[in-house]
């Protein structure tokens, strides 16, 4: 989009290689035939995503003629501001009464302040546990922060510091998420589709079902030139030759790589294998050519520490709705804000959080149904009602665990999960790979030293 708008490049000079049959990457939202609605994750946005909103001021709305996606987004959140009436529960759906408090001691506050002002180089390869102790980890602040951003205790202290600095304006709104903004529908329909229509309208060429398996560089003293893009197109090998006048933009790695999708009756398999065409495999092959291209193994070598799971739940009738409404204290069918961001079951073995955004979440969503999202930070610990790890659970079993934490009577849980909901689990082995401890040089520069194209 920037190449077209700001770079004045002709659209038919731009080629996008996409390994899936649809675009959007992690910004997804679709209905799989025979499985149901699936959203792997969601975007928590705010007023200070300046680059993003600068882009969407130029992307026309698909719903309202003559206005931009940014216009729609601004008007929507002005008329229906986001905030939560219940940020956390405990004891099976009871308000945890965090009551807007951070619960930080003086020592905990000092640990946060010290981290904020620590030079980056002193945090290289350090974990969050190296800079915080129980004064922070037992606080409401850490509950709010870790579940909002999906930080684990073993993640990078440097990344924690960078997030604190980038989202300092969120701190006051952490207890009720009032700094967040959301789109009308799921992220794919509200953001990706308008962008794709804009690009298609300018003649950009999309190549779907096309895996990039390698990019071969010619390396000479002080110069790195991408010479060939190696492709698998419907499993047939192809090569695209490049010149110094071409520009190559690479997605190195990827948080939703090796994703597996289950169903109401099947678990989502944990399979972190890196195959040709996978973003991590591609980055490894590029990095093997020169150290300036980074060290992907720092991020993708321990999927046990970079995974979590989500599930998309669709209510099929009215029986679950009162339990949702009891917690969020709003009418889920109003078309306005429902939970106002995630609700965390703070005493959940999976550290389960869930949310229902404005309904319908999909344009074709049947009337009378709700589509929500659940995620668990701990995929390998037993549940509280379902006594096995989340990664081993079917969609129905994940729904049962969620219903337990909503406060549904135990003698109704299985019936509601089976007949009143459809739940689709998703396992993402590398979803927090970018949070792993790191040092300088592990991530390549946006334009690596000596790169010419």
Predicted regions and their residues:
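C-terminal segments that line or cap access tunnels to active or ligand-binding sites in enzymes
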Residues: 170-183, 245-247, 252-453
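Helical element adjacent to the flavin cofactor pocket in flavoenzyme catalytic cores
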Residues: 165-247, 252-253, 265, 271-280
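Short, solvent-exposed loop/turn and secondary-structure capping segments
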Residues: 26-29, 159, 259-264
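Short, well-ordered alpha-helices that flank and scaffold nucleotide-derived cofactor binding pockets
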Residues: 2-5, 197
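Rossmann-like flavin
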Residues: 62-169, 180-182
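Conserved FAD-binding subdomain of flavin-dependent enzymes
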Residues: 34-75
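Glycine-rich FAD pyrophosphate-binding loop
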Residues: 4-31
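Extended hydrophobic secondary-structure segments that form protein cores and membrane-embedded regions
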Residues: 14-21, 71-75, 248-250, 374, ...
């Amino acid at each position: 989009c920037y190449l077209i708008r700001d770079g004045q490049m002709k659209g038919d000079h731009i080629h996008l290689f996409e390994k899936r049959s649809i675009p959007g990457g992690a910004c997804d939202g679709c209905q799989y035939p025979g499985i149901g609605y699936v959203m792997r994750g969601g975007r928590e946005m705010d007023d200070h995503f300046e680059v993003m909103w600068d882009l969407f001021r130029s992307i026309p709305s698909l719903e309202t003629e003559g206005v931009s996606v940014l216009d729609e987004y601004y008007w929507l959140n002005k008329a229906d501001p986001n905030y939560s009436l219940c940020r956390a529960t405990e004891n099976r759906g009871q308000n945890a009464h965090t009551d807007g408090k951070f619960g930080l001691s003086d020592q905990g506050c000092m640990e946060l302040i010290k981290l904020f002002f620590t030079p980056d180089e002193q945090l290289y390869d350090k974990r969050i546990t190296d800079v915080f102790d129980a004064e922070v980890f037992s606080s409401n602040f850490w509950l709010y922060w870790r579940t909002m951003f999906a930080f684990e205790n073993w993640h990078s202290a440097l990344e924690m510091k960078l997030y604190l600095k980038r989202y300092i304006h969120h701190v006051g709104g952490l207890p009720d998420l009032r700094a967040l903004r959301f789109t009308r529908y799921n992220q794919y329909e509200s953001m990706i589709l308008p962008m794709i229509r804009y690009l298609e309208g300018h003649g950009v060429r999309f190549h779907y079902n096309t895996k990039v398996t390698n990019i071969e560089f010619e390396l000479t003293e002080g110069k790195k030139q991408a010479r060939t893009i190696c492709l698998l197109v419907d499993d047939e090998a192809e090569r695209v030759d490049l010149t110094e006048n071409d520009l190559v933009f690479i997605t190195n790695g990827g948080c939703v790589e090796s994703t597996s999708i289950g169903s109401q009756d099947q678990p989502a398999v944990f399979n972190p294998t890196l195959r040709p065409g996978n973003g991590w495999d591609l980055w490894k092959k590029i990095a093997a050519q020169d150290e300036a291209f980074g060290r992907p193994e720092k991020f993708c070598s321990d999927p046990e520490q970079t995974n979590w799971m989500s599930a998309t739940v669709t209510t099929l009738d009215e029986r679950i709705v009162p339990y949702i409404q009891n917690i969020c204290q709003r009418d889920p069918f109003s078309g306005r804000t429902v939970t106002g961001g995630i609700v965390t079951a703070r005493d959940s073995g999976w550290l389960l959080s869930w949310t229902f955004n404005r309904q319908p979440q999909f344009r074709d969503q049947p009337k009378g149904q709700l589509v929500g999202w659940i995620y668990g930070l701990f995929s390998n610990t037993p549940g509280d009602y379902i006594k096995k790890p989340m990664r081993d659970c079917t969609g129905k079993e994940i729904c049962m665990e969620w219903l337990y934490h909503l406060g549904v009577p135990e003698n109704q849980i299985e019936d509601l999960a089976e007949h009143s909901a459809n739940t689709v689990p998703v396992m993402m082995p590398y979803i927090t790979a970018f949070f792993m401890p790191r040092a300088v040089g592990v991530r390549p520069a946006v334009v690596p030293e000596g790169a010419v194209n």
